[in-house]
Amino acid sequence: LDLIDLHIKTVQAEQYARKYRHPVFLHMKTVRLMGHAGSDIETGYMSLEELSKIERQDPLLFSARILMDNKCLRSSDINNLYEECRKRVSKIFEYASSRPKLIDSDEIMSTIVSNVSNTIKPEIPKQIDRKKIFGKEYSRLDKKYHMAKLINYALHDILMQYPNTVIFGEDVGKKGGVYHVTADLQKNFGSRRVFDSPLDETSILGFSSGFGHNGFVPIPEIQFLAYFHNAEDQIRGEVATLSFFSKGQFTNPMVIRIPGLAYQKGFGGHFHNDNSLAIFRDIPGLILACPSNGSDAVKMLRAVTKEAHKKGRIVVFIFFLCLFLVIDLHNPKDNK
């Protein structure tokens, strides 16, 4: 591995990606130094000649040769630099080893949720701004509607109140989602804040993590609850562990919207109805919301968005599909 050539090519790749907004792949040859673990005895399956050849390609030694060949450093300079680094690492290791250990469950769990709060408090949208955004719908806001419509209204308000929110997912843009929950959002707020994603749940949650790292509060949609399980490790292994592993220094907030649970009559298929909630209850620090009616859904959606913005919380918001378009909630013609 030629580190100088790698640096040059990486800078070129970065410039290309920024200019043309295209992905860039770096194709390089690497070597495998030493075994995978202490029990991996390389001499059991590789000859001494093979091991020696690999060691001669050690990037550290190769880089040292480049520096000497180009008269950047002498061998004694490189040895001194190596020894200084070794001593510094040893000193830091000794210091880290002497630090107090975590002694109880409270200490261990203290950073599952970050204690850092966002002090910026977005103002509630003014009525004149709401009237402009909602247009003809403004005069209908006080009427009773099913859950899907009420959530749509709530998302309009959230996008107005929190300028750092973005909404994305499969067909959530111009189409407005399968159940029109995101209808007119792209028209009213533009394609930079409301946009379609690839048909890939891993990418959707990966995008969300990246947005969260950069000061946004993403509100992604996973089209059906069963689809989440294709990408659950993005949340379990990456997103939800960030605060814990960084000692509360970093967060990547998000509000993941997922329709699921009991389905509309006549629609089947395990890829839509495999509704396991156990995965969410097994992830420390995650907020799981599941409203039973449209009015509660609006209040809860506002509340969890505030938690995500202020405290960097990770939220999974499950909507009952069977209630999305229901008007008579408890009894026939009750219009609740």
Please describe what each predicted stretch is:
Residues 1-98, 281-336:
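Glycine-rich ThDP/TPP pyrophosphate-binding loop and its adjacent helix/strand module
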Residues 43, 79, 104, 185, ...:
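Ubiquitous "structural anchor" signal
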Residues 76, 95, 99-111, 118-119:
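Outer-membrane beta-barrel domain signature, strongest for Gram-negative TonB-dependent receptors
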Residues 82, 102, 175:
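Conserved phosphate/pyrophosphate-binding and hydrolysis machinery centered on Walker-type P-loop NTPases
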Residues 109-314, 322-324:
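Thiamine diphosphate
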